[in-house]
C-alpha cells in the first residue's frame, strides 16, 4: 500500500513541478528537467534559450532531480497526496511541510554558476531569476560573463600567481602604451613590426594558452616571430610589475591559476556543482579549458549554443568546441530547440535556405507558429546612396502606420558601410545611433579621471600614472617622467614611490616642487576615498586634480568642446552614483573600475531611445527588431572578398548571414547595390550568393526606378548623384531629392550623372547616334555651366531627339538633345533659384516624421536651419535644401 501511495505521489509531484514551469514546449521542458550529467542544448535563433536557462536553474534549486524520479525521502501518506492534489487543483503553493518530499538532490542558489557572453545577457538572466526565485535567492546565483567570472576568481586568488588582489585591468589604449615602452626598451622599429601586429599575435598566444616561455622556446618561422616572442615576455613582465592584467589575461591567467593550484580548482568545483554556459559555439580554446577546469567530477555541465550562429572565429572562437561536445563528454544528452518565437515563417525559411548550404553543422530546421508574414523584401539599388534613400522611405512609411524609429535596425557586414546611411540620415534629420562608435568611457576626459581613480586603487599602475601626471599641465615634462621610471626600475618600486620622495633624488631637483604638489594631490585623493562616498570621491577627483578648473578656463576662452567635456564629467559622477545604488554596501572603487573595464559596445546600447539603430551583424548577435535592413548583400562585401578563398571562412560568412536574417521579427529587407563606393573606390559587385540561395517563393524583389527604366529601354550604364554641398561621392534615390533619371536617344540608352558639389555646373545631353549615349547633369557651386550633346560610337555630327531629366523634389526638367547651349549661368545663382525657403508658421510634411510647423529659421551657408515642431516626434532641426520636406496647406 505504501508503495502504491508513493507511486501516486511521484506522479502528482511531476504534475505539480510541471505547473511551476508552465508555457514551455516539449523540447524546452525536456531541457529544464534534465538536470544530471552533461547536457547539450542546440538552441536555434529565437527559440527561447534564456527561458530555458532561467527555468532550468530554478528547477535545480527548487526541486533538483525530483521530476521523473520514483523515489521519495520517506514513504508517501494519504495526507501528502491530499495536500499536493489540492495545491495542483487550486494553483497554490504546496504546504511547507511537503518541501522535503518535493525535492531531490536540490542545491542552494550559490551552488549554481551561469556564464554568458555579454553583460546585457547576464543582467537579463539575473533579473529573471530574481522574479522567479525571489530577490535574495535569485541574487545568490552567480550569473556573469566569462571575463567577470575570471575577475571575481582573480580578486580572491591573484596573489597565488604573483599579482596583487587590487590589480588593474588595462584596456586597448593602456596596452598600446605599455607596448610603446617595451618597443623602446628593446629598440624595436614599429615600421618593421607594427605594435598592432604584435598585440594581435600575443592575443592569439594567450587564447591558445601559450605562455611567454613557450613562445620563446618554440621555433620561430622568421625574425618577426622570434622578436614577437621577446616582446611578449617583456610585455608580461611590465604588466606584472604594474600589478595589471590586460583583457586577454583575465581568462588566460585564471586558467593558469586553476590548472596549477589544485586547492583553488577543488574549491570552485565543490562550490559550483552545476555549471551552465551560454553561447558555447563562440567559446575559444582558453574558454573551453576554463569550463573544463570548473566542471566537477559529477560532470553537471550544461552548454547552450547554436553551431549555426558561430561567428567569432576572428576572435579565436572555435566551432569544434560545440561540434565535439558529445565526444568530449561521454553520456551527453542532446536536445534541439527548433521552434522559433521571434520571426515569421518566411523569414525563417529564408534563413534555413541559406544555412543548409553549410556542411560543418549539427543540423536543425527552425519553424514557427507565428504565421507566414510578409515575404522578404529584396531591393537592388543603383548605389549606396540609393540604398540609404530606400531605407528612409520604408522607415517613413512605418512611422506613418504608427511604428517607432527604435523598431528599425540597419545591419551591415563591415563598419565602413555605415557612412552613407549615417550621412543620409543626418541630412534628413532622422535620429539614429551607431552601436560601436566612440564609447562614453573612451572619451579623453573620462579616461583621464578614471586613470586618477586607478592609481588610487592600485599605486603600482605606472601606465595610468604616465597618462595623467601632467594632465592638467603641471610642468612635469617627458624627460622628468623617464627619470622617474628609471629610478623606479633601479630600486624595484613604483613610480609613485619615487614621486613621494622626489626631494631625495638629485636627478629630480629641477622638478621637485611640481612632483611634491602632485604627491599632495594623490594623498588628498586617498583621504577622500577613505572618508567620502564613492560618488563624492569621483567628484573630488575632478575638483582636486584641477581638471574641472582647466575645462572651465577652456570654456571661458570659447573652446567649443569644453562645455561638453564638463557635462561628460558630470555624467561620470552620475555613473558612479548609479553603480553605488546598484551595489549598496558592496560598492568599491575596484568594483566600479572592473565594471567599466568589462563594458562592451552592446552593453551601452540603449533600447529605450527612439532612434534607428545602425550596427554590424556581429554586434547585433542576441538582439531582435521588428524591422531589419540587411544591407550590402553583394559578392566581395558579404561574403567578404577574402572569405572566397577558404571554405571555412565562407561557412562563417554564411553563418553571419543567418544571424543577420534571424534578427528580424516582422519584416526583413535585404539590399544589394549595382555600384558601391568602399574605401575610396567604386566597386561593381554581383548580388551575394546568399541571396541566390534563398528560394524565390520566400522573397519579393524590387529595383531602383532608374534601373527599371534602363532595363525597360534595353540599355545599360550608371547613374551617380551627390546631394551633399561640396561633396564628391555619387548619390541617387528613387523618391528623394536630387534624383536623376535616364537620357536616351534613338541609337541606344545612356547613363545619367548628377553631382551637386565640386566646382563645375555642367549639363550634357545625350543625342542620337549609332551606339549609346550619355547624359550628364552636374550642379556645382562655383563656376558657370555649359552643355553639349553627342553620340559616343556613332557619327559625331548626328544629334537626335533624346532627353535627359533630373529630378529635384519631384520637379522634372527636360532638355532637348538637339540643343547645344552655353548658358553662362553661375552655379551659385542656379542653386539659389531652386533653393527652398521657409518662414516661421509654415506647415510642412517630412517623409519620415510626418506633419509639423516651422517654429524658427536660421540662415546657414546659403541654406536654412529649420526648426520644426512635428506632431508625432516633437522638435527637430534640419537643413532646408537637403531634407525631405514639402510645404503644405492647412487643408491638406
Where in this protein do the model-derived segments appear?
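Helicase P-loop NTPase motor core
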Residues: 47-53, 68, 73, 77, ...
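C-terminal accessory regions
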Residues: 633-874, 882-892
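Short basic/glycine-enriched coil/helix segment immediately N-terminal to the Walker B
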Residues: 33, 37, 104-109, 256-275, ...
Amino acid at each position: 500500500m505504501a508503495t502504491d501511495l508513493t507511486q501516486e505521489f511521484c506522479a502528482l509531484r511531476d504534475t505539480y513541478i510541471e505547473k511551476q514551469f508552465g508555457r514551455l514546449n516539449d523540447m524546452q521542458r525536456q531541457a529544464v528537467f534534465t538536470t544530471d550529467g552533461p547536457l547539450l542544448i542546440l538552441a536555434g535563433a529565437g527559440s527561447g534559450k534564456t527561458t530555458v536557462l532561467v527555468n532550468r536553474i530554478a528547477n535545480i534549486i527548487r526541486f533538483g532531480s525530483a521530476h521523473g524520479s520514483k523515489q521519495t525521502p520517506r514513504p508517501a501518506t494519504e495526507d501528502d497526496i491530499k495536500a499536493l492534489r489540492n495545491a495542483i487543483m487550486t494553483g497554490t503553493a504546496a504546504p511547507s511541510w511537503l518541501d522535503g518530499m518535493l525535492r531531490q538532490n536540490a542545491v542552494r542558489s550559490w551552488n549554481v554558476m551561469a556564464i554568458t557572453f555579454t553583460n546585457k545577457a547576464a543582467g537579463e538572466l539575473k533579473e529573471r531569476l530574481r522574479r522567479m526565485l525571489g530577490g535574495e535567492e535569485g541574487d545568490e546565483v552567480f550569473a556573469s560573463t566569462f571575463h567577470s567570472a575570471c575577475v571575481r576568481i582573480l580578486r580572491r586568488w591573484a596573489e597565488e600567481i604573483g599579482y596583487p588582489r587590487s590589480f588593474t585591468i588595462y584596456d586597448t589604449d593602456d596596452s598600446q602604451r605599455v607596448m610603446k615602452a617595451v618597443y623602446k626598451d628593446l629598440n624595436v622599429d614599429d615600421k618593421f613590426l607594427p605594435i598592432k601586429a604584435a598585440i594581435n599575435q600575443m592575443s592569439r598566444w594567450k587564447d591558445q594558452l601559450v605562455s611567454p616561455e613557450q613562445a620563446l622556446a618554440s621555433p620561430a618561422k622568421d625574425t618577426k616571430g622570434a622578436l614577437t616572442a621577446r616582446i611578449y615576455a617583456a610585455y608580461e613582465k611590465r604588466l606584472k610589475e604594474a600589478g595589471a592584467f590586460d583583457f586577454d589575461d583575465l581568462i588566460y591567467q585564471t586558467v593558469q591559476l586553476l590548472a596549477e593550484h589544485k586547492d583553488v580548482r577543488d574549491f570552485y568545483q565543490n562550490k559550483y556543482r552545476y555549471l551552465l554556459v551560454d553561447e558555447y559555439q563562440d567559446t575559444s580554446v582558453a574558454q573551453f579549458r576554463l569550463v573544463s577546469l570548473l566542471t566537477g567530477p559529477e560532470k553537471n555541465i550544461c552548454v547552450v549554443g547554436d553551431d549555426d550562429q558561430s561567428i567569432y572565429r576572428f576572435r579565436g572562437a572555435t566551432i569544434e568546441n560545440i561540434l565535439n561536445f558529445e565526444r568530449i563528454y561521454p553520456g551527453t544528452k542532446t536536445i534541439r530547440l527548433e521552434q522559433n518565437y521571434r520571426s515569421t515563417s518566411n523569414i525563417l525559411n529564408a534563413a534555413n535556405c541559406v544555412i543548409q548550404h553549410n556542411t560543418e553543422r549539427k543540423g536543425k530546421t527552425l519553424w514557427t507558429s507565428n504565421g507566414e508574414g510578409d515575404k522578404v523584401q529584396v531591393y537592388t539599388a543603383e548605389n549606396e546612396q540609393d540604398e540609404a534613400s530606400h531605407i528612409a522611405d520604408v522607415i517613413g512609411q512605418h512611422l506613418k502606420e504608427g511604428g517607432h524609429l527604435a523598431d528599425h535596425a540597419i545591419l551591415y557586414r563591415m563598419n565602413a558601410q555605415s557612412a552613407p546611411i549615417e550621412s543620409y540620415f543626418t541630412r534628413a534629420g532622422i535620429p539614429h545611433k551607431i552601436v560601436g562608435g566612440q564609447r562614453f568611457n573612451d572619451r579623453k576626459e573620462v579616461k583621464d579621471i578614471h586613470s586618477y581613480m586607478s592609481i588610487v586603487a592600485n599605486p603600482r599602475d605606472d601606465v595610468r600614472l604616465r597618462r595623467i601626471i601632467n594632465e592638467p599641465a603641471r610642468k612635469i615634462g617627458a624627460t622628468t617622467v623617464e627619470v622617474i621610471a628609471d629610478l623606479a626600475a633601479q630600486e624595484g618600486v613604483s613610480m609613485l614611490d619615487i614621486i613621494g620622495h622626489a626631494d631625495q633624488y638629485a636627478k629630480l631637483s629641477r622638478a621637485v616642487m611640481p612632483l611634491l604638489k602632485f604627491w599632495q594631490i594623490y594623498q588628498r585623493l586617498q583621504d577622500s576615498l577613505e572618508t567620502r562616498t564613492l560618488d563624492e570621491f569621483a567628484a573630488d577627483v575632478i575638483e582636486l586634480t584641477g581638471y574641472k578648473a582647466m575645462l572651465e578656463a577652456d570654456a571661458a576662452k570659447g573652446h567649443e568642446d569644453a562645455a561638453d567635456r564638463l557635462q561628460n564629467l558630470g555624467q561620470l559622477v552620475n555613473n558612479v552614483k548609479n553603480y553605488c545604488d546598484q551595489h549598496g554596501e558592496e560598492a568599491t572603487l575596484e568594483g566600479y573600475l572592473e565594471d567599466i573595464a568589462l563594458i562592451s559596445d552592446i552593453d551601452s546600447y540603449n533600447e529605450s531611445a527612439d532612434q534607428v539603430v545602425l550596427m554590424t551583424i556581429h554586434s547585433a548577435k542576441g538582439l531582435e527588431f521588428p524591422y531589419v535592413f540587411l544591407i550590402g548583400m553583394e559578392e566581395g562585401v558579404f561574403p567578404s572578398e577574402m572569405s572566397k578563398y577558404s571554405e571555412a571562412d565562407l561557412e562563417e560568412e554564411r553563418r553571419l548571414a543567418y544571424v543577420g536574417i534571424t534578427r528580424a521579427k516582422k519584416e526583413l529587407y535585404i539590399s544589394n547595390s549595382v555600384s558601391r563606393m568602399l574605401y575610396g573606390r567604386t566597386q561593381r559587385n554581383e548580388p551575394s550568393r546568399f541571396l541566390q540561395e534563398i528560394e524565390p517563393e520566400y522573397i519579393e524583389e524590387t529595383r531602383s526606378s532608374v534601373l527599371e527604366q534602363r532595363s525597360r529601354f534595353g540599355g545599360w550604364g550608371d547613374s551617380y548623384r551627390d546631394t551633399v554641398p561640396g561633396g564628391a561621392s555619387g548619390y541617387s534615390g528613387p523618391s528623394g531629392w536630387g534624383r536623376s533619371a535616364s537620357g536616351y536617344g534613338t541609337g541606344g540608352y545612356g547613363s545619367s550623372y548628377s553631382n551637386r558639389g565640386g566646382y563645375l555646373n555642367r549639363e550634357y545631353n545625350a543625342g542620337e547616334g549609332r551606339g549609346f549615349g550619355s547624359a550628364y547633369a552636374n550642379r556645382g557651386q562655383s563656376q558657370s555651366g555649359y552643355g553639349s550633346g553627342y553620340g559616343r560610337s556613332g557619327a559625331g555630327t548626328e544629334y537626335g531627339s533624346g532627353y535627359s531629366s533630373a529630378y529635384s523634389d519631384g520637379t522634372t526638367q527636360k532638355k532637348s538633345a538637339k540643343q547645344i547651349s552655353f548658358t553662362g549661368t553661375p552655379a551659385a545663382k542656379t542653386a539659389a533659384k531652386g533653393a527652398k525657403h521657409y518662414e516661421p508658421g509654415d506647415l510642412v510634411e517630412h517623409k519620415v516624421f510626418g506633419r509639423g510647423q516651422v517654429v524658427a529659421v536660421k540662415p546657414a551657408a546659403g541654406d536654412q536651419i529649420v526648426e520644426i515642431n512635428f506632431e508625432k516626434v516633437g522638435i527637430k532641426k534640419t537643413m532646408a535644401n537637403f531634407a525631405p520636406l514639402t510645404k503644405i496647406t492647412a487643408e491638406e
